[in-house]
From Swiss-Prot:
<dbReference type="GO" id="GO:0000166">
    <property type="term" value="F:nucleotide binding"/>
</dbReference>
<feature type="binding site">
    <location>
        <position position="253"/>
    </location>
    <ligand>
        <name>substrate</name>
    </ligand>
</feature>
<feature type="binding site">
    <location>
        <position position="366"/>
    </location>
    <ligand>
        <name>substrate</name>
    </ligand>
</feature>
<dbReference type="Pfam" id="PF21252">
    <property type="entry name" value="Glyco_hydro_109_C"/>
</dbReference>
<feature type="binding site">
    <location>
        <position position="284"/>
    </location>
    <ligand>
        <name>NAD(+)</name>
    </ligand>
</feature>
<feature type="binding site">
    <location>
        <position position="126"/>
    </location>
    <ligand>
        <name>NAD(+)</name>
    </ligand>
</feature>
<feature type="binding site">
    <location>
        <begin position="175"/>
        <end position="178"/>
    </location>
    <ligand>
        <name>NAD(+)</name>
    </ligand>
</feature>
<keyword id="KW-0326">Glycosidase</keyword>
<comment type="similarity">
    <text>Belongs to the Gfo/Idh/MocA family. Glycosyl hydrolase 109 subfamily.</text>
</comment>
<feature type="binding site">
    <location>
        <begin position="104"/>
        <end position="105"/>
    </location>
    <ligand>
        <name>NAD(+)</name>
    </ligand>
</feature>
<protein>
    <recommendedName>
        <fullName>Glycosyl hydrolase family 109 protein</fullName>
        <ecNumber>3.2.1.-</ecNumber>
    </recommendedName>
</protein>
<dbReference type="InterPro" id="IPR000683">
    <property type="entry name" value="Gfo/Idh/MocA-like_OxRdtase_N"/>
</dbReference>
<feature type="binding site">
    <location>
        <position position="224"/>
    </location>
    <ligand>
        <name>NAD(+)</name>
    </ligand>
</feature>
<feature type="region of interest" description="Disordered">
    <location>
        <begin position="1"/>
        <end position="32"/>
    </location>
</feature>
<keyword id="KW-0520">NAD</keyword>
<dbReference type="InterPro" id="IPR036291">
    <property type="entry name" value="NAD(P)-bd_dom_sf"/>
</dbReference>
<keyword id="KW-0378">Hydrolase</keyword>
Length: 494
């Protein structure tokens, strides 16, 4: 045990290691209907009903019906606990980690946890035992004791979450499993970090917010793009006023994934492709939305209030299948409804506009757009370029490299970080583990996770209703009006 860590507050109402917690899991319909296997994911029949009662019934109705359904879910239910905004972690000398999911992403991310001092990987879990054993060998190769392995069945992750020697659970599994796994981790007294998106239904987002507040456990969307070098530089410049009063921004996940989604070996089964048979909207808003929301202090002085979405005809995946997949391939049984490109306009309480795009099924170069504009100028990424008054007055883009002095301290401290995605993965894991060790407030919280993910179900509804604006819930229940720190941290004393 960590002898210098204060005992973690137990979840209110439901002791984390009691039979009551198990009973809650057994009663959760999402836990019953979704199996953590390729066959379970494919056969679970997660169509529109997976979005919740409001979404399923409104999907094919009129715009007024869609608005009514969204408003019903947007209304904040009574608070069950206390806000988690600004709540620090408990200080500890060592962060003990359990990892659920060791496919492509999990297998690479475990290396980053093992590279950090003061971090121990205590348990690993995957339904494919070979993957769990491979991860366990990495742990011992790093000089740590052999971790416990959980690979018995699709429910074995529950036993990992029940362990008394884990502080933080990292969830790296198919999207439909993120919600039940995050929920189980918090019910068992663990802080939890989840890959994108954190859930697929508005009702699930509210449940995670409420459970985080009630259990006093942090539930975070581990959004690595918030830690990109350019993103963190723009953040500091924006908060220093170089862009003037912020007016607009844009973010995207435009990434041609057709080959990977039809590759039988890259993903563990067709789970990612199958979401294009279920939803029409933006399936992956977080990479683009998170950084722009940070620039604008969303949940920390401003909030997003509505979203309006449109989408193109779904042609890309079917065309790729026609050209590349043999007759008899299981994919020929699939009917794709997901728009090749979705475009959403998000309005904030202060009148700012955020444009979100999503396109993984047509040919194009990679781009997250990552733009920000204000009364003094604008930045756009892919390629990076900037135009700021009074320096720029000739209507020509300027070199963003000139602004290196505004790099975040994390990038000055770790100039050439290891790991994937240009080093942002390492920066994210380093900072999260630092916050947990030193007892700091996390850079983002459950409210950010919920806001960044809300476009998943809402964009689908809006597209079905011909682009009608829909309300985005205030997951903070009014706490957004209070100015507080976020990603723009200063280097802490160790």
């Amino acid at each position: 045990m960590n002898d210098d860590a204060r005992p973690a507050p137990e979840p209110q109402d439901i002791p984390p290691h009691s039979g009551a917690a198990d009973e809650v899991n057994r009663q959760d319909p999402s836990r019953r209907s979704v199996l953590w296997t390729t066959a379970g994911v494919a056969g679970a029949g997660l169509g529109l009903g997976a979005l919740g009662a409001g979404t399923a019934s409104a999907a094919g109705r009129s715009a007024p019906d869609a608005v009514a359904a969204a408003e019903a879910v947007a209304a904040a239910p009574p608070r069950q606990g206390r806000t988690m905004a600004g709540v620090p972690f408990e200080r500890r000398s060592t962060v003990r980690v359990g990892i659920i999911g060791l496919g492509n992403r999990g297998d690479s991310m475990i290396d980053l946890f093992l590279a950090l001092p003061g971090v121990q990987v205590k348990a690993v879990c995957d339904t494919v035992r070979d993957k769990a054993e491979k991860a366990a060998k990495k742990v011992t190769a790093a000089g740590q004791p052999a971790p416990a392995i959980y690979a018995k069945d699709e429910h074995d992750y529950e036993n990992l979450c029940k362990r008394g020697d884990i502080d933080f659970v990292y969830v790296v599994t198919p999207w439909e499993l993120h919600f039940p796994m995050a929920k189980t981790a918090m019910l068992n007294g663990k802080h939890v970090g989840v890959e994108c998106p954190i859930a697929m239904r508005l009702e699930e987002l509210w449940q995670l917010v409420d459970l985080s507040e009630r259990t006093r456990r942090h539930c975070m969307q581990l959004e690595n793009c918030c830690y990109g070098k350019n993103e963190m530089r723009v953040l500091r410049m924006a908060h220093a006023g170089l862009f003037g009063e912020l007016q607009h921004g844009a973010g995207a996940y435009n990434h041609d994934l057709r080959e990977l989604m039809f590759d039988p070996d890259y993903y563990e089964g067709p789970w990612r492709r199958l979401w294009h048979t279920r939803l029409r909207g933006d399936l992956y808003p977080n990479h683009g939305f998170g950084p722009v929301a940070n620039y604008m202090d969303v949940n920390r002085g401003d909030r997003v209030v509505s979203i309006s979405s449109v989408g193109t005809t779904p042609l890309g995946l079917a065309a790729y299948r026609e050209e590349h997949m043999p007759a008899g391939d299981p994919s020929w049984k699939e009917s794709y409804i997901g728009a090749d490109r979705t475009i959403s306009l998000v309005q904030t309480a202060k009148g700012r506009v955020i444009r979100l795009e999503h396109d993984v099924s047509s040919p194009h170069p990679y781009s997250r757009i990552n733009s920000l504009g204000g009364t003094k100028g604008v930045f756009e990424d892919y390629p990076e370029r900037i135009y700021l008054e009074p320096t720029n007055t000739n209507h020509q883009w300027d070199d963003f490299k000139k602004y290196a002095e505004w790099d975040h301290w994390l990038w000055k401290e770790h100039a050439n970080p290891p790991g994937g995605h240009g080093g942002m993965d390492y920066i994210m894991v380093f900072r999260l583990m630092q916050c947990m060790r030193l007892g700091l407030v996390p850079d983002f919280d459950v409210y950010d996770a919920a806001v960044w993910t809300a476009p998943v179900p809402l964009s689908h509804l809006s597209i079905k209703a011909k682009g009608v604006p829909l309300p985005i819930p205030d997951f903070t229940r009014g706490e957004w009006k209070k100015t507080r720190s976020g990603m723009d941290s200063e280097k802490p004393a160790e």
